[in-house]
Amino acid sequence: MRYLKRLSWYISILILIVVIAGCGKGNETKEGSKEEQIKKSFAKTLDMYPIKNLEDLYDKEGYRDSEFKKSDKGTWTIYTDFAKSNKPGELDDEGMVLNLDRNTRTAKGHYFVTTFYRNGKLPDEKNYKIEMKNNKIILLDEVKDDKLKQKIENFKFFGQYANLKELRKYNNGDVSINENVPSYDVEYKMSNKDEIVKELRSRYNISTEKSPILKMHIDGDLKGSSVGYRKLEIDFSKRENSKLSVIEFLSYKPAKK
């Protein structure tokens, strides 16, 4: 009889634990999991895409915190690069960064062509100064290579053509968190049928049939911070020791120090 009472007591405790755990899970769903919080944090920026006319950013204000002076309208920075391993032990990285100062309504930056080496050799890096006027990239440095010159002058940032509404359908991603930094990452396997995947294959002549991985990274507070940053990467890499990806970020920082 004592055995049955003890068994009944154990079962009651077990049921109570399961109920409490279930309630905790429900609360997490209600409040939003870390995955959902990361997606919502990215949505604040990605919902602005596509930004066909980058000069529209002069009239848009991002997240402001105590780092901003009251009179400072801030600076938007948009960045896109295409990284590819063309040779073993080498990584070619090519793209553009543009800073749009809302105080002066001027946009300056550079186009970069960089080769990184794994053997400890210093990278080969070339930067070409640019500015933007009337939503058009103007090359400020002399470039003798006509093909490169046209590539720079006709360059389009990922954020100018990307429609990322499809990202909302992605769920159950691989999430990793470092609370000490803090930093947050989530990864999703994309579909080759996604319009943005088709667009990138066309623009960068990506021949691999492998479905890419979408990587979303946040450094800083999920609610927003002018100190941290958000980076989006679409990774087409076939193998661990090779690289084939497009990286994009759009940030809003104080213009005045």
Swiss-Prot record:
<comment type="similarity">
    <text>Belongs to the staphylococcal tandem lipoprotein family.</text>
</comment>
<keyword id="KW-1003">Cell membrane</keyword>
<keyword id="KW-0449">Lipoprotein</keyword>
<protein>
    <recommendedName>
        <fullName>Uncharacterized lipoprotein SA0396</fullName>
    </recommendedName>
</protein>
<feature type="lipid moiety-binding region" description="N-palmitoyl cysteine">
    <location>
        <position position="23"/>
    </location>
</feature>
<feature type="signal peptide">
    <location>
        <begin position="1"/>
        <end position="22"/>
    </location>
</feature>
<keyword id="KW-0472">Membrane</keyword>
<dbReference type="GO" id="GO:0005886">
    <property type="term" value="C:plasma membrane"/>
</dbReference>
<keyword id="KW-0564">Palmitate</keyword>
<dbReference type="Pfam" id="PF04507">
    <property type="entry name" value="DUF576"/>
</dbReference>
<feature type="lipid moiety-binding region" description="S-diacylglycerol cysteine">
    <location>
        <position position="23"/>
    </location>
</feature>
<dbReference type="InterPro" id="IPR007595">
    <property type="entry name" value="Csa"/>
</dbReference>
<keyword id="KW-0732">Signal</keyword>
<dbReference type="InterPro" id="IPR038641">
    <property type="entry name" value="Csa_sf"/>
</dbReference>
